[in-house]
Swiss-Prot record:
Reaction equations catalysed: 2-C-methyl-D-erythritol 4-phosphate + CTP + H(+) = 4-CDP-2-C-methyl-D-erythritol + diphosphate
Organism: Clostridium perfringens (strain 13 / Type A)
Site (Transition state stabilizer): R16, K23
PANTHER family documented for this protein: 2-C-METHYL-D-ERYTHRITOL 4-PHOSPHATE CYTIDYLYLTRANSFERASE, CHLOROPLASTIC
InterPro entries: IspD, IspD/TarI, IspD/TarI_cytidylyltransf_bact, ISPD_synthase_CS, Nucleotide-diphossugar_trans
Example of a GO MF term: 2-C-methyl-D-erythritol 4-phosphate cytidylyltransferase activity
Name of the protein in its database record: 2-C-methyl-D-erythritol 4-phosphate cytidylyltransferase
Pfam families from the UniProt entry: IspD (PF01128)
Gene symbol of the encoding locus: ispD
Key words, A-Z: Isoprene biosynthesis, Nucleotidyltransferase, Transferase
SUPFAM superfamilies: Nucleotide-diphospho-sugar transferases
PROSITE patterns named among the record's database cross-references: ISPD
UniProt site (Positions MEP for the nucleophilic attack): R154, K210
Length: 225
């Protein structure tokens, strides 16, 4: 089995939280959100290496205020880019020999060991895989005037989560393509689809939330208790 590397993207700001620090540094039960995220990957036996991606102006803060408090097993800290895809590109370029790479939102602090292990397994089998859950609400498609024009079958819809998991050579090829062709994407599975490849969607977890709003923070505090 080749090496498995996880890339943790911790570039989110805390504006919607009304916080003075970036959301990954907001504390829950005395520990920053990023602590719980890193801990989940450190405790997974299938992960060989962890790369943390931070904005340039937050690397010193992390090293000074966060890292000394915890025994993190981070192999390297990489400077993020202007957009999410730029941050992933920087991280991929920092990886040497690697078989599988998992790309995860730093604010998804409650990812389970099962999701991580399943992601490794399915990406080895299919080349690309991501967890997801069925939307709980009915989804509507609206036109530019604001009117509903379609109601997709909810059974065919998936709200995609992270970690999004790939064979390294596949996702590296995809990121090179969108970089060279200046294509904007919203996540990494979209990059693989642009290559004409399929992404296997496996069962995620409704608990695997991205902590983004004050309401999310209340739920996160409940999960930690």
């Amino acid at each position: 089995m080749g090496k498995v590397v996880s890339v943790i993207l911790a570039g989110g700001k805390g504006k919607r939280m009304g916080a003075e620090v970036s959301k990954q540094f907001i504390e829950i039960n005395g520990k920053p959100i990023i602590y719980y995220t890193l801990k989940a990957f450190e405790e997974c036996k299938g992960i060989d290496e962890i790369i943390l991606v931070l904005p340039k102006d937050e690397i010193d803060y992390f090293k000074r205020e966060i890292e000394p408090r915890f025994d993190f097993k981070i192999s390297k800290i990489i400077e993020g880019g202007k957009e999410r895809q730029d941050s992933v590109y920087n991280a991929l370029n920092s990886i040497g020999d690697c078989d599988i790479v998992l790309i995860h939102d730093g604010a998804r602090a409650f990812v389970s060991n099962k999701i991580i292990e399943d992601g490794i397994k399915y990406s080895r089998e299919f080349g690309a895989a991501a967890p997801g859950v069925m939307p709980k609400d009915t989804i509507k498609v609206k036109n530019l005037e604001g009117f509903s024009v379609d109601t997709p079958n909810r059974a065919s819809l998936v709200a995609v989560q992270t970690p999004q998991c790939f064979k390294y050579n596949l996702i590296k090829k995809g990121h090179n393509k969108v970089k060279n062709e200046k294509i904007q994407v919203t996540d990494d599975t979209m990059i693989v689809e642009l290559l004409g490849e399929k992404v296997y969607l496996f069962e995620g977890d409704y608990k695997n939330i991205k902590v983004t709003t004050p309401e999310d923070l209340i739920l996160a505090e409940h999960f930690v208790k």
